[in-house]
Design a protein with these regions (language model features):
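Compositionally biased, low-structure terminal segments
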Residues: 8, 16-18, 37, 53, ...
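Short amphipathic beta-strand/extended segments with alternating polar/hydrophobic composition
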Residues: 33-41
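Mixed-charge, Lys/Arg-enriched low-complexity segments
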Residues: 42-79
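N-terminal acidic leader/helix
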Residues: 2-34
């Protein structure tokens, strides 16, 4: 597995890996993570991956983290 890049954006850690002819985009926030697998054949240049760190896609990642966090917190309160 090759690390393509790692950085933080808006408090979310973003890691990009190349593995088994796929790019793995991993977003982490606290105890939660979201991972997306993209076939390398769908990406002409690694810079094409930048579209996954901005705009509507990234906004939905952030929104999903909020929803996940609320569900997780409710479940912890029910323990």
């Amino acid at each position: 597995m090759r690390v393509v890049s790692e950085f933080s954006k808006d408090g979310i850690r973003v890691s990009v890996f190349s593995w088994n002819n796929k790019y793995l985009l991993k977003y982490e926030l606290g105890p939660m993570e979201q991972t997306f697998k993209i076939p390398e054949t769908d990406i002409l240049e690694e810079s094409d991956l930048d579209s996954f760190y901005q705009g509507e896609f990234f906004d939905k990642v952030v929104s999903r983290f909020k929803e996940m966090g609320e569900s997780f917190q409710k479940q912890l309160e029910n323990l």
